Amino acid sequence: MKKFLVLLIALIMIATLLVVPGVQTSAEGSYADLAEPDDDWLHVEGTNIVDKYGNKVWITGANWFGFNCRERMLLDSYHSDIIADIELVADKGINVVRMPIATDLLYAWSQGIYPPSTDTSYNNPALAGLNSYELFNFMLENFKRVGIKVILDVHSPETDNQGHNYPLWYNTTITEEIFKKAWVWVAERYKNDDTIIGFDLKNEPHTNTGTMKIKAQSAIWDDSNHPNNWKRVAEETALAILEVHPNVLIFVEGVEMYPKDGIWDDETFDTSPWTGNNDYYGNWWGGNLRGVKDYPINLGKYQSQLVYSPHDYGPIVYEQDWFKGDFITANDEQAKRILYEQCWRDNWAYIMEEGISPLLLGEWGGMTEGGHPLLDLNLKYLRCMRDFILENKYKLHHTFWCINIDSADTGGLFTRDEGTPFPGGRDLKWNDNKYDNYLYPVLWKTEDGKFIGLDHKIPLGRNGISISQLSNYTPSVTPSPSATPSPTTITAPPTDTVTYGDVNGDGRVNSSDVALLKRYLLGLVENINKEAADVNVSGTVNSTDLAIMKRYVLRSISELPYK
């Protein structure tokens, strides 16, 4: 804890060097508070996820990581125009982004500390001077604008590009208490913003490295009070969250190993194929939900917010036993049966098949090009999983891994290799092969090809509709669809000559105006509406105006001008 506090103090000192002199960097309040409230929350009925009116939805999304990394931002924003990237993702029909983040970053924010993110203003001028918390909310605003929802995923205890390799949700710095407090803070902070529809409590709990497993260093699933019992911690954390925010979906992943007799009575166990005793079932990290049969998550009155969430991959990520033997020569239908019988059914598919819960396949995907010796088998796996998802539409939801190019063993939907360039992409292209053959077939869309979003008012990108625009949609109260995607805004009180705060002249006052004014004060732009920017009517535009603008957008003050 001492190290952690020293680190946080250092981060405060760094952050203060990155902001406009004289401007307070308090981020209490956010654009999320200004969102359309409470019309897009989801819950579970049987093996379906439904909206507040009981209409079935299908979460068909993709992962976009970076806030879990040392850069503390959505990766690819240093390659391209991040707004153009987000708009393209929406136009391609991805209705949810699963966004990995780290516990230490959430906890820092909860303590009023806002570490810096990597500067990408050379590609994204609107991001100039934004700290990690401001940048996160800027991304939420833009996801909202194009009709994309977000599932927030704690990927690792600390911001670390390899943090997913750590097996547990706690370490010597991030305790279980901090883990829970960080999540409860997020719940309180965003409970009125349905851009974030769900929390994936912890990414891929698993065992220690090597074939000799140490129980105390590994995630287990049972009814014990052990600190490493993921079932207990997930249940307690979920209940604490739901007491504050009863509308959010809770996604609970599995573990890696599970004892064949259901009893974790070995302090160590050997999983070597040569020297081990074969007493444990193994699977992908986070993909083993066999324990649900013996020890299901019990959220009491909040049970309708629970969704179990396995992960699954192909042989390029790791050559599991089921990718050997008959799988190699099998046709696609035979291969799918092998995967189902040897992995999917008993590890997680039974949960939806027995009516326990719907599932979110939180990660799947893989390489679709290149010279890897297992590429053909990887493509066979992807076809099998794609078809299995489609066969279980509405019961099996999914978020594809991943959007950005930075995943070494899977690649991304963005690529620098063969693909289609897009405006703002600069050196990035869209991977048509991966998208067209594996993701597009399992995106939620109408019979005539319109993508279906999860927002009731904002259509999904330029090629989609809102859920309330479905022809068979049944509302209790009909939401009014928006003609074009637009951000939630606060309009400044009208005056005879000027709309104070409308620095960019678009008729609204929101965080875009704050970003533009910040760029002006940093000398990055020259032409703004200075009369509108002079929100304290002092006759000059300076950092005081920026501070007032922030307070207005964050709802600390209700009127402009502010004298």
UniProtKB/Swiss-Prot annotation:
This is Endoglucanase B. Belongs to the glycosyl hydrolase 5 (cellulase A) family. The gene is celB. It catalyses: Endohydrolysis of (1->4)-beta-D-glucosidic linkages in cellulose, lichenin and cereal beta-D-glucans. One of its GO terms (biological process) is cellulose catabolic process. SUPFAM superfamilies: (Trans)glycosidases (SSF51445), Type I dockerin domain (SSF63446). PANTHER family: ENDOGLUCANASE, MAJOR EXTRACELLULAR ENDOGLUCANASE. It holds the Pfam family Dockerin_1. It comes from Acetivibrio thermocellus (strain ATCC 27405 / DSM 1237 / JCM 9322 / NBRC 103400 / NCIMB 10682 / NRRL B-4536 / VPI 7372) (Clostridium thermocellum).
